[in-house]
Regions:
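Class I (Rossmann-like) S-adenosyl-L-methionine-dependent methyltransferase catalytic domain
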Residues: 1-51, 75, 79, 93-167
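GHKL-family ATP-binding catalytic core of two-component histidine kinases
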Residues: 53-55
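A conserved beta-strand element that flanks and buttresses the S-adenosyl-L-methionine
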Residues: 63
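Short catalytic micro-motifs in class I SAM-dependent methyltransferases
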Residues: 66-70
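Short, conserved SAM-binding segment of the class I
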Residues: 79-83, 87
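Short glycine-dipeptide loop
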Residues: 88-92
């Protein structure tokens, strides 16, 4: 992305941050509009999150915000999560849209009234579905946080790598 969370991620001076996006243009925007003091703390690279050019267990944590709700097919989300399992040593933090709240209900109602489009790029994922996928990819849910409980679709999960599973 464009570095929206880089400030938070670099608060700890001992933390080394790698930022990755499938679009070099997005990375360049982040580098252009953030202070040099910040960007010098971050190594950026262009890559697909489905195939990261990193060795197994290369990073302590993966912070993946505002990506999963763009992936409509379970098999694609599972592939992504398995790649995160491979590359992370311990934890993964992800955010996405989930059901079970007012906004998801309103969105479903809105979508049912729309003319069907060939392409859709944002999805409300059922909680039960995504949590099953986390498990299949080798993660245990350590915690989750709803942005505004029972109202907003945004949920952030902290996933812990289950060492008994090799993906």
């Amino acid at each position: 992305g464009t570095g929206r969370f880089w400030y938070v991620l670099t608060e700890n001076p001992k933390r080394h941050v790698y930022a990755c996006d499938n679009s070099q243009k997005m990375i360049d925007i982040g580098l252009q509009y953030r202070e040099k003091q910040l960007t010098k703390k971050i190594d950026t690279f262009k890559a697909s999150a489905f195939s990261l050019p990193l060795s197994d267990g290369y990073v302590d944590n993966i912070f993946c915000i505002r990506l999963l709700h763009h992936i409509g097919y379970s098999e694609d989300r599972l592939k992504l999560l398995k790649e995160f399992h491979r590359v992370s040593k311990s934890t993964v933090i992800v955010s996405l849209w989930v059901d079970g709240n007012v906004k998801a209900w309103k969105r479903k109602k809105l979508e049912s009234n729309r003319t069907k489009r060939h392409y859709q790029n944002r999805f409300v994922i059922p909680q039960r579905t995504i949590e099953k996928e986390f498990n299949e990819a080798g993660f245990t849910i350590k915690a989750y946080l709803d942005f505004i409980p029972k109202y907003a679709m945004w949920r952030t999960y902290i996933l812990e790598k289950n060492e008994n599973i090799s993906c």
